[in-house]
Amino acid sequence: MKITVIGAGNVGATAALKIAEKQFANEVVLIDVVEGIPQGKALDMYESGAVSLFDTRVIGSNDYKDSADSDIILITAGLARKPGMTREDLLMKNAAIIKEVTSQVMKYSTNPIIVMVSNPVDIMTYVAHRVSGLPKERVIGMGGVLDTARYKNFIAETLNISMQDISALVLGGHGDAMVPVVNYTNVAGIPLTELLPLDIIDGLVERTRNGGIEIVNYLKSGSAYYAPAASTVEMIEAIARDRKRILPCTTLLDGQYGINSVFCGVPVKLGKNGIEQVLEINLSAPERSALQRSADIVEKNCKMLESLFA
C-alpha cells in the first residue's frame, strides 16, 4: 500500500511518521512545496526505522509525480490558524490551496481515498470532493475523531479514570458548532449523566468546542498537531487494514439526519472502500437542531466558494 501525505508541516510529518511506524503501508511519500523540507524530514524518519523497528519506505519530494498510484492521500497542506483567527477566517486562502493540491494529486492517482485534515475541514473536504470527482465515499474529512478524542480526554481528566473506558461521539462541523452527543457518552457502559452533574458536563462540552483554540492560545504561533495526527492515522489505519471501525467523520450526507448535500461529521463505518456506511443514530430534538445549525454553517460557507469554481 502506498500513502501520500501532502504538507510536511507538523501535522503531516507527525502523521507520516506514525504511519511508517505502524507498518500498514509499504511506502509513505511526503510532499511539500518548500524544497528540502520533505526530503530532510522523510530521510530523518526513514533512518529512525532502525531504532523503532519498521521497514516502511519513507520518501520526501516536491514533485506530485512521486504520489503516482497512491491508495490513500492525506491532505494537510494549508495555512495554520493563529490567535484570534477562526477556522472560517482560513476559508478562502485554504480553499485555493486545496483546489490546486487536489487537482495535482488526481493527475497521478486514478481512484485514491482522500483524507482531509486542512481547516476548515468540512469545507475543504467539499472542495476536494468537487475538484477530484471521486465518489463521496472516497473523500473523508477528519474532525469528529479529533473532537471526540478531546471530549474523552476532558471526561477522563474530570473523573480521574482511563480514557480507554470512555465511549463518546462528537458530531457536526469541526468548529464552534460541533455537537458532543451527551446521550451517547458512557464510561464502561455507565451513562455519563449518572457520574457527573449536568453543569459539569456542559462545561466539558464547551471546553471541547474550544479545544483547538485553547492550544492555539498557548502556542501563539501554531496550532495542535499531535492529537490531529493521531486522529488522522486512526482513520487511515481503519481503511488500510479494512477494520470496519465506527468513527465520527466528515462525509457528504444524502438525506441522513434530514441533511442533504452538505459535508457534516456523523458516525460512519470505515473500511477498505472508505466510508462503507453512514450510521443514523437517534438524537434528541436539541441535538438534531444543533446538528442542523452546524450543517447550515458549512453550507453557507461552501456557497461563498462558488467564485473559486467559476
Curated annotation (Swiss-Prot):
One of its GO terms (biological process) is lactate metabolic process. NAD(+) binds at residues 7-12, 32, 94, 117-119. It comes from the Bacteria. Its EC number is 1.1.1.37. It is an enzyme of class 1 (oxidoreductase). SUPFAM superfamilies: LDH C-terminal domain-like, NAD(P)-binding Rossmann-fold domains. Substrate binds at residues 81, 87, 119, 150. The keyword Cell membrane does not apply. GO terms for molecular function: L-lactate dehydrogenase activity; L-malate dehydrogenase (NAD+) activity. It catalyses: (S)-malate + NAD(+) = oxaloacetate + NADH + H(+). It holds the Pfam family Ldh_1_C. The active site is at residue 174. Keywords: NAD, Oxidoreductase, Tricarboxylic acid cycle. Catalyzes the reversible oxidation of malate to oxaloacetate. Belongs to the LDH/MDH superfamily. MDH type 3 family. This is Malate dehydrogenase. It comes from Chlorobium chlorochromatii (strain CaD3). The gene is mdh.
